[in-house]
From Swiss-Prot:
Protein name: Conotoxin Vt15.1
Coiled coil: none
Domain notes: The cysteine framework is XV (C-C-CC-C-C-C-C).
Signal peptide: 1-19
Top-level taxonomy: Eukaryota, Metazoa, Spiralia, Lophotrochozoa, Mollusca
Presence of keyword Disulfide bond: yes
Main location: secreted
Propeptide segment residues: 20-43
Post-translational modification: Contains 4 disulfide bonds.
């Protein structure tokens, strides 16, 4: 078991030891996303329709008293 765990821990220490590699990955994703939008390419978003026909993208429905609104995730 120990020979399997040691290479995994070593790869994590090299990859994210100073946090720069992980931050660099986020920067790359942000650049690609921005380029996608600049060229007018659509970015697939999670959209669904609420009970009253309201369309919510990247959020959830809240329908008190049969009036639906979209609430961002995590709020």
């Amino acid at each position: 078991m120990m020979p399997v765990i040691l290479p995994l821990l070593l790869s994590l220490a090299i990859r994210g030891g100073d946090g720069q590699a992980i931050q660099g990955d986020r920067d790359l994703i942000a650049k690609l996303f921005k380029r996608y939008q600049e060229h007018g390419l659509s970015v697939k978003r999670a959209c669904h329709t609420c009970d009253d026909g309201t369309e919510c993208c990247d959020s959830r429905c809240s329908c008190p008293w049969n009036t639906c609104t979209c609430i961002p995730w995590g709020k």
